[in-house]
Design a protein with these regions (language model features):
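Residues that mark the junctions of alpha-helical repeat units in TPR/alpha-solenoid scaffolds
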Residues: 407, 461, 505-507, 512-514, ...
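Specific register positions within alpha-helical solenoid repeats of the TPR/Sel1-like families, i.e.
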Residues: 419, 436, 443, 463, ...
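Bacterial signal peptide processing site
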Residues: 31-34
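Helix-turn-helix repeat elements of alpha-solenoid scaffolds
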Residues: 431, 484-498, 542-549
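Alpha-helical junction/boundary sensor with strong preference for TPR arrays
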Residues: 438, 499, 506, 552, ...
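Secondary-structure boundary elements
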Residues: 62-186, 216-218, 227, 387-390, ...
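Hydrophobic/aromatic-rich core segments of domains that either
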Residues: 126-144, 152-162, 167-171, 177-178, ...
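"A position-specific structural signal for the A-helix of alpha-solenoid helical repeats
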Residues: 511, 518, 522-525, 569-579, ...
Length: 594
């Protein structure tokens, strides 16, 4: 019997050795505490060497371990005598944090601390995921005009909408990086992903909406400030709001003068359908992430010469002035204790032992429902959903079923991560190889006889053997008898081939669907880059778009009616296919061969 692990490298090398779920790894990593400051004098060269070490670390692979190391190095640097340190928050800034952003005493302590914290590891990990995504978009950062910045904002918003389809379920919203890796989310999550990528490229953004009361905000558009104008984007529909006459992107100034431009967006998102009144009374609301409010983040972005530049810190006092130049008096949305606001979304997702403020106990934390949403448990073999196999072996077998989905979607350098960071060649190779491996497994399964009966017999034999071990222990029988019974259980666990094949049969189709969707999305992203960077090569652009269209049709034709598909995913695929077909239709006719 061939070893299944040789067919499926996505699984662990040992079938019974199930690792900690990948999404938990960043939360389980302990961050180093700040070293005790040294009292020795430090030369300017030593100071520069310490900062150079931080820069070298951040240039490496962007994952939690990288930023754990960087935080430790930063705290070593800050522990030495040096003038190049983060500024201290001014009294007016402290007042705004306490009275406008309604930070608790513990949150203020986190924001105002002078050294870098365990929570900063998670924040930097999130920021650099979005920074890598922006770099993968191949944007032109050399142009500094408002028009160029508007185009960068439009392209980043479009990318966020492609990567996260709308599954508008009522639930506590995830932090942006987690919603992004998941690939779908409710309206608040989709909005959060767009805000996060706009933030890291240096565009001030928030939402336009009306506060029903002190704890309920009804946003109807996303707003990004470019120069002295505020442009409106629709995260529900995934498109910019059209301006007057359908031209360009509508500005808030235009909508204030002509509320009819916002009618569809107000009616879709606000309980009060009096459009004119809603537009007149709406504000621009900002909700910067908690960690971004710290002066140390503004300092850090000034000493990290990355390309393109990365915006890590929010200057809320400056934001007030800049939006005022655009004619708007902004406000901040972060009601006291509201863990769903963008300000608290990441900080209250991270558990307290890792520097966060997650209020719920294990089993009730947001991470638990997050992991569950990524695995099609309804497709799991009935033997594992019932009580035929129980205890630790059942958990291991369920892990073998679920681990591939978690690893594929969440782990650094797995295909989803590669697509997000713009590593398309690596993603293509990995995705095609995975589809080939699934076909190999499916061909082997097709040649099996009595697979279900064999798996059931194994499960019943294992249950009997495990029960015997428990009975012998309970009756305090001899060590020899217990050892022999335990050996029988171990032998059965090594001979679980039929059960393993049943698991593979159940997992292969939903996993193939996940892979095919990412492959179509990867081809779509590649075609989008080709269309922007090789504008004079119509045939090359056409080939890229047609390749993408072929994969979208492949996905929809094979999985379009599958019951395990997440709500909204098929509609999203259809929309992206329609976009591709529209792009192809705009191209000049293909040159005929002589």
């Amino acid at each position: 019997m061939p070893n299944l692990a040789s067919w499926f490298r996505i699984l662990t090398s040992c079938r019974w050795n199930i690792a900690i779920p990948i999404a938990l790894i960043p939360l389980l990593i302990g961050c180093p505490s700040r070293p005790q400051p040294t009292r020795n004098s430090t030369s300017h060269t030593d100071q520069e060497d310490a900062l150079a070490a931080v820069r070298d670390t951040v240039r490496k692979e962007h994952k939690a371990d990288t930023f754990k190391t960087a935080v430790a190095q930063l705290n070593v640097y800050l522990g030495r005598p040096t003038d190049a340190k983060p500024a201290i928050a001014s009294p007016s800034e402290r007042d705004l944090l306490a009275n406008k952003l309604h930070l608790s005493a513990d949150e203020l302590k986190e924001v105002l601390r002078e050294d870098f914290s365990p929570l900063d590891v998670h924040y930097l990990d999130e920021c650099f995921l979005f920074h890598d995504a922006a770099r993968g978009l191949k944007l032109d950062f050399a142009q500094k005009s408002d028009a160029a910045q508007l185009e960068r904002g439009r392209l980043c918003f479009a990318w966020a909408m492609r990567q996260v389809w709308l599954n508008d379920k009522p639930s506590r919203p995830l932090p942006p990086s987690y919603a992004l890796r998941m690939g779908f989310g409710n309206l608040a999550e989709r909005t959060g992903v767009a805000l996060a990528i706009l933030q890291v490229i240096g565009i001030d953004a928030g939402v336009v909406g009306i506060a029903k009361d002190r704890t309920t905000l009804e946003p109807w558009c996303l707003a990004m400030r470019i120069g002295n104008e505020i442009y409106l984007l629709d995260p529900r529909g995934g498109k910019p709001v059209p301006g007057e006459g359908g031209k360009g992107i509508a500005t808030l100034r235009q909508v204030r003068k002509n509320p009819a431009l916002a009618q569809a967006y107000v009616q879709a998102n606000v309980s009060n359908n009096d459009v004119a009144s809603t537009v007149a009374n709406s504000k621009v609301w900002l909700s910067p992430p908690l960690s971004s409010l710290s002066p140390r983040m503004r300092w850090l972005q000034s000493v990290l010469p990355v390309n393109p530049p990365v915006a890590l810190g929010a200057d809320v006092l400056s934001d007030i002035d800049e939006f005022a130049k655009a004619g708007e008096t902004i406000d901040f949305w972060n009601p006291e204790g509201d863990i769903t606001s963008m300000t608290r979304r990441l900080s209250h997702f991270v558990r307290q032992s890792d520097g966060g403020f997650e209020p719920n106990p294990p089993g009730q934390r947001l991470i638990d429902s997050y992991l569950s949403s990524l695995v099609p448990f309804a497709q799991m073999p009935a033997l594992l959903r019932g009580n035929v196999v129980t205890g630790d072996p059942a958990n291991r077998l369920r892990g073998i079923f679920s681990q591939r989905f978690l690893k594929f979607q969440l782990e650094v350098d797995q295909p989803r991560d590669q697509v997000l960071r713009g590593h398309f060649d690596d993603a293509n190779r990995a995705l095609v190889e995975l589809l080939s491996e699934i076909k190999t497994v499916q061909r082997h399964i097709a040649g099996e006889t009595d697979l279900d009966q064999g798996a059931l017999k194994w499960a019943e034999d294992w249950r009997h053997a495990a029960s015997q071990v428990e009975r012998l222990k309970r009756d305090k029988r001899s060590e020899q008898e217990i050892h022999e019974a335990t050996s029988r259980v171990a032998a059965l666990e090594k001979a679980a081939d039929k059960m393993m094949l049943v698991i593979e049969r159940s997992a292969s189709e939903p996993f193939a669907g996940m892979i095919t969707f990412q492959l179509a999305l990867c081809k779509h992203e590649q075609a989008e880059r080709v269309a922007r960077t090789r504008r004079d090569e119509a045939d090359v652009i056409r080939d890229a778009w047609q390749n993408s269209a072929g994969w979208w049709r492949n996905y929809l034709g094979r999985f379009g009616t599958a019951g395990w598909i997440q709500p909204g995913q098929i509609n999203h695929a259809k929309k992206l296919l329609a976009e591709v077909e529209s792009e192809i239709a705009k191209l000049p006719a293909a040159k005929s061969n002589p």
